[in-house]
Amino acid sequence: IPLSENPGFAKANNLALQQATGEFILFLNPDTIVAEDTFRQCISFFEQQYDVASVGVQMIDGSGTFLPESKRAFPSAAAAFFKLSGIAALFPHSPVFARYNLGHLSLDEIHRVDVLSGAFMMVRKTVLDITGGFDEAFFMYGEDIDLSYRLSKTKKNGTAYANYYLGTV
């Protein structure tokens, strides 16, 4: 989509979302390299689980290091305190002290999580139709937390939807 200016991550993705017609919508950063069968595995998970709002995958950086933003809890004052004070780093696998990055959850398994990264977030279109896309008040950063929150609060025909981290992908 040609744009004369940078409208920000949220607005740019929402412009694309307006033109999207697929059953699943993938928000993907342009510098992301995706393994060959990633999309197939994600779609298969959607088809097997009726309550999936969105899926994210195990993201790694160029040096092979796991990116903790792949799976997160909703931010809180306690999580910020534990991170800024260094307590989370002292106890990286604690469900209390390392709650924000969900350090107690295995990297290589499937988990229901609060927040997925906007760098790779595949979303069921029917759920996006209810929640709307990204909040354009966010120019960059935080918009994935907001959308993850709204997706996790969505209900339709008695189904409560959830966000899933696919550590196997």
Regions found by a protein language model. Give the residues of each.
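Glycine-rich, basic loop-to-helix element that forms the pyrophosphate-binding segment
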Residues: 2-20
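A short, conserved alpha-helix in the catalytic core of glycosyltransferases
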Residues: 106-168
